[in-house]
Amino acid sequence: MFLQINRTSELARVFGIDFFSVLSRGSQYRVESMLLRLAHTQNYLAISPGSQQVASQPAMECQPLVMEPESGFYADPVVVLDFQSLYPSMIIAYNLCFSTCLGKVAPSKANTLGVSSFSPDPSVLKRVKNEILLTPNGVMYVSSKVRKGIMPRLLEEILSTRIMVKQALKRLFPSQKILHRIFNARQLALKLIANVTYGYTAAGFSGRMPCAELADSIVQCGRSTLEKAISFVNAHDKWKAKVIYGDTDSLFVLLKGRTVKESFQIGNEIASAITAMNPNPATLKMEKVSHPCFILTKKRYVGYSYESPEQSEPVFDAKGIETVRRDTCGAVSKTLENSLRLFFEHQNISELKAYLQRQWTRILSGRVSLQDFVFAKEVRLGTYCTRSSSSLPPAAIVATKAMRADPRAEPRYAERIPYVVIHGEPGACLIDMVVDPLELLAMDSPFRLNDLYYINKQIIPALQRVFGLVGADLNRWFIELPRPIREAFAKRPFSAPNAQRTRIDYYCLSKHCTLG
């Protein structure tokens, strides 16, 4: 609790807003607090558009570059390079701001700029024609020699201050824990405000002062910078490198036949060369080397990563797959991570097949922990566009069942509700097979964990998306697996406290045939 108060206090000091507003207000309020204070010192006043003006401004047209990756398994090192604070760097480097924008080269018929009417003065354009920067989306800006923009000035101060705070953080002694927490919260606040400044210009729905042309200029300058970097790396004969994936501000560069140490050396050379190509402060940083790794699709990859050439033991690094996602159960994430580690270390399909068949045998035999098979998904009752309970998500169905038994069991908004999938009647839908884990654990429970659902619908699809890239057919492996004999259920005592013996199926040990 004290740490949260300390962090919030530092955020309030940096943003220049009150304590409660840090918790209750959004990022636009924070940006505007700092932006307007600086604008007033330069004799600027901000416009205050109405909702109709915001809704009627032109739509944004530019998107960041996200390449379609070359999906596959890479046994050779893949260098990951990242532009530090790409969008703030573009704002500073090209002096992009509300106060420096001269409008489009080919103005629209409505003569608008963002949310307001604007027509550039021909005499002004003629006077500063040698100091005009034309961005890739066709919008003109004056250079910093003519006028230094408010946003570039703000971001320069934020980034330089953050560097000083981080340097001071490194000089602290281990015993200075309170100062360490204060400085860390302060540099985090500066990082947050720098990263959301672009979003302030691009908030086209509920924006306080959006400008589509300015937002497009920032995105398009960043996209152009990344495209030039990709072309430069692919065309350089010395490195013999190939960019296999690019995402907004990062590059994945394949170096065939190189060691991890050589990859770090080449990666640093690439970073230095591309940094020298771009205006200050745009900086490409060598982030890590992945060796080996899988690249699945956009924003989904996994591998063993090294952050320095001296690092001996790699770190398991995953993004976008089931090992780091919260919408699956522990059995899926653990099986996938263990399978990946096994394959990365031995790169042997036969060993992987043997491991997975052992895991499937354990699941079919019931020798598993129920905790690994519990889903926990968010429930937002009152937001589902359906009148029938049969169309609700499984977690919402479990929540409504609990509410029928006890109205006080209504979940909070976006609360995660646990549930498991059990065996049902032949042809039963998923919504008829979800129950609270406590119902499955009850002494007189007739339910049994639906092992085939977890294997066929959860584990195999997650693993097939990854290992299908190396030719593995997990469905065939499962079909080839001899089915184990499940141990018989313990006999239910007839002296159980449950007196509701109104149906014959109460006396059955299970609704599922153990011979089937």
Which residues does each PLM region occupy?
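Catalytic P-loop NTP-binding/switch module of NTPases
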Residues: 141-150
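DNA-dependent DNA polymerase catalytic subunits
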Residues: 13-122, 126-136, 146, 154, ...
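Gly-rich Lys/Arg/Thr-decorated short loops/hinges at beta-loop-alpha junctions or inter-strand turns
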Residues: 202-220
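Conserved glycine-bearing catalytic or ligand-binding loops at nucleotide- and phosphate-handling centers
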Residues: 9
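Flexible hinge/switch segments at interdomain interfaces of large molecular machines
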Residues: 134, 197-208, 245
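Non-transmembrane amphipathic alpha-helical segments
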Residues: 155-172, 190
